[in-house]
């Protein structure tokens, strides 16, 4: 098979033809016909409600494109859920707890003697908080550098080009914009009959700031967030039980990878109760009691814990914005309906990130934000949602991009599979961290890579070679014929690619 040249491939994914819908075309032309604000005008070209990953990135990009921009953020700190009470603080705790676990259980294998290792939880939480503060200040600095106006307060629509803002200092102001982008993110999804008090019954926010390590922790929900936070407190000494209504953990994950991942977590003493329904939660006593039953019905049982983490997903934050007053259409879940240029049914009103359909991921929201303001500026923007990577930041990590084997079977696509275990990777063996594998799915006829799934200590970093390859329609042979430095973990991706179209060398 001749090697395909990535450099010669047409990067068709960077552009997109305008929709054939007359309604969409009308909205787009109306939007552009508004023109851009002059430097002396009090009207903005772009107003963004929400300063999370989608909102703040959109604001900076809009300003870089020459658009007068204002960003409104109710929290008083930029970065949204991700930076303040999500991605960043959780990764800080995941890293700190992993260091503690390594010191306690792995240092001896490397000839390092430690007499005693203790958790200083206040110091650990302080390190997490400092990381958050430094990063939020960093975004404020980027706003100043790019001349983005920052308004701290809660914004609501008055009209399609006016937002009333109740500022955090108690004042009120009106912000006008030719184009308004809703980037308000998402909130914790509640469960019927369960009241989150952020003390004994906590959301992911409360789980980031527990005052002590609970002896027993029950996690409701076996998704990304639940497994990550369960890992944090499990490493620090909690007995962790995960209760999940579905029959699998992380249902969107490739089935083969998911099974190995669950076995890995079980080795770390994380317990799973799958196909289990939470009937009620009682926190009136010192601890918390959960009444559960089989998902299909049956005999009930009682589970006891010191803390219960409710991690049953997230819901778009669109209530309280007065969207209905200006006629913006939403679906039953509260997501704003937009076209392929992020424009709602109301001319001049756009939406990005968690408030529109698609994966609720910070990096997806960032891409939405860039593409949206590019459209507003009269340029081409594009986000391919089939090629957005996902990562579970446990240890080992699990990262994926593209299709799973189950999806390809359902779609009737003929494919080949190539796998390579890290047990056969020299760098992984050298650092005594060889759990996991790389799995590549490629089209049987063309060898085009359709999906890549990695379980490894640093899978979240390794996946991006695959993301680039998939975006450029690379074949498995393309990756296999690229020289990879030795010894590196990334050689496992090369070997898996070799296994996909031919044979690997080291197994």
Curated annotation (Swiss-Prot):
Subcellular location: Mitochondrion matrix
Recorded GO CC terms: apoplast; mitochondrial matrix; mitochondrion; nucleus
Pfam families hit by this protein: Pyr_redox_2, Pyr_redox_dim
Record InterPro entries: Class-I_Pyr_Nuc-Dis_Oxidored, FAD/NAD-bd_sf, FAD/NAD-binding_dom, FAD/NAD-linked_Rdtase_dimer_sf, Lipoamide_DH, Pyr_nuc-diS_OxRdtase, Pyr_nucl-diS_OxRdtase_dimer, Pyr_OxRdtase_I_AS
EC number: 1.8.1.4
Keywords: Disulfide bond, FAD, Flavoprotein, Mitochondrion, NAD, Oxidoreductase, Redox-active center, Transit peptide
Cofactor mode of binding and number, as noted: Binds 1 FAD per subunit.
Binding site for FAD: 73-82, 91, 155, 184-186, 354, 360-363
One Gene Ontology term of the molecular function aspect: ATP binding
Catalyzed reactions per annotation: N(6)-[(R)-dihydrolipoyl]-L-lysyl-[protein] + NAD(+) = N(6)-[(R)-lipoyl]-L-lysyl-[protein] + NADH + H(+)
EC class name: oxidoreductase
Origin: domain of life: Eukaryota
S-S bridge residues: 82-87
Annotated function: Lipoamide dehydrogenase is a component of the glycine decarboxylase (GDC) or glycine cleavage system as well as of the alpha-ketoacid dehydrogenase complexes. LPD1 is probably the protein most often associated with the glycine decarboxylase complex while LPD2 is probably incorporated into alpha-ketoacid dehydrogenase complexes.
Reported induction: Up-regulated by light.
An annotated GO BP: response to cadmium ion
Organs and tissues of expression: Preferentially expressed in leaves, flowers and siliques and at a lower level in roots and stems.
PTM description: S-nytrosylated at unknown positions.
Family: Belongs to the class-I pyridine nucleotide-disulfide oxidoreductase family.
Note: The active site is a redox-active disulfide bond.
Active site residues of this protein: 486
Transit peptide: 1-36
Residues noted as binding NAD(+) in the record, renumbered to the chain: 221-228, 244, 278, 313
Protein name per the record: Dihydrolipoyl dehydrogenase 1, mitochondrial
Assembly: Homodimer. Part of both the glycine cleavage system composed of four proteins: P, T, L and H and of the pyruvate dehydrogenase complex containing multiple copies of three enzymatic components: pyruvate dehydrogenase (E1), dihydrolipoamide acetyltransferase (E2) and lipoamide dehydrogenase (E3).
Cofactors named for this entry: FAD
């Amino acid at each position: 098979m001749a090697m395909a040249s990535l450099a010669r491939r047409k990067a068709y994914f960077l552009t997109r033809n305008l929709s054939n819908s007359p309604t969409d075309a009308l909205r787009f032309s109306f939007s552009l016909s508004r023109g851009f604000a002059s430097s002396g005008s009090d009207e903005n070209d772009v107003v963004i409600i929400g300063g999370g990953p989608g909102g703040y990135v959109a604001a900076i990009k809009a300003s870089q494109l020459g658009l007068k921009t204002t960003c409104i953020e109710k929290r008083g700190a930029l970065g949204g859920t991700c930076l303040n009470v999500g991605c960043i603080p959780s990764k800080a705790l995941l890293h700190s707890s992993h260091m503690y676990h390594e010191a306690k259980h792995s240092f001896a294998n490397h000839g390092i003697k430690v007499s005693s290792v203790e958790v200083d939880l206040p110091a650990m939480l302080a390190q997490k908080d400092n990381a958050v503060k430094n990063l939020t200040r960093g975004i404020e600095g980027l706003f100043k550098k790019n001349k983005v106006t920052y308004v701290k307060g809660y914004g609501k629509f008055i009209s399609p080009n006016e937002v009333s803002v109740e500022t955090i200092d108690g004042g009120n102001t009106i912000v006008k914009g030719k184009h308004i982008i809703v980037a308000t993110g998402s909130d914790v999804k509640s469960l019927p009959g369960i009241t989150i008090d952020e003390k004994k019954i906590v959301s992911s926010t409360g789980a980031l700031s527990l005052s002590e390590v609970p002896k027993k922790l029950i996690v409701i929900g076996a998704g990304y967030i639940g497994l990550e936070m369960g890992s944090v407190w499990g490493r620090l000494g909690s007995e962790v039980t995960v209760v999940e209504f579905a029959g699998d953990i992380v249902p969107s994950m490739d089935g083969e990878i998911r099974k190995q991942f669950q076995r890995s977590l079980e080795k770390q003493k994380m317990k799973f109760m799958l196909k289990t329904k939470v009937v009620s939660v009682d926190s009136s006593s010192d601890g918390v009691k959960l009444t559960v039953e089989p998902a299909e019905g049956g005999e009930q049982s009682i589970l006891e814990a010191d803390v219960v983490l409710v991690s049953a997903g997230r819901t778009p934050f669109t209530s309280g914005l007065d969207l209905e007053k200006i006629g913006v259409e939403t679906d039953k879940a509260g997501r704003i309906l937009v076209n392929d240029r992020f424009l709602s049914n109301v001319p001049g009103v756009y939406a990005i990130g968690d408030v529109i359909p698609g994966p609720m991921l910070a990096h997806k929201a960032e891409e939405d934000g860039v593409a949206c303001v590019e459209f507003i500026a009269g340029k081409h923007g594009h986000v391919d949602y089939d090629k957005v990577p996902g990562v579970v930041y446990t240890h080992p990590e699990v990262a994926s991009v593209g299709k799973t084997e189950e999806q390809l079977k359902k779609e009737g696509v003929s494919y080949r599979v190539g796998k390579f275990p890290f047990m056969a990777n020299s760098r992984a063996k050298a650092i005594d961290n060889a759990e996991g594998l790389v799995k590549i799915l490629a089209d049987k006829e063309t060898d085009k890579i359709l999906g890549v799934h990695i379980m490894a200590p640093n899978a979240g970093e390794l996946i991006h070679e695959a993301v680039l390859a998939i975006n450029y329609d690379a074949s498995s042979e393309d990756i296999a014929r690229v020289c990879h430095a030795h010894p590196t973990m990334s050689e496992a991706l090369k070997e898996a690619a070799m296994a996909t179209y031919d044979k690997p060398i080291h197994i």
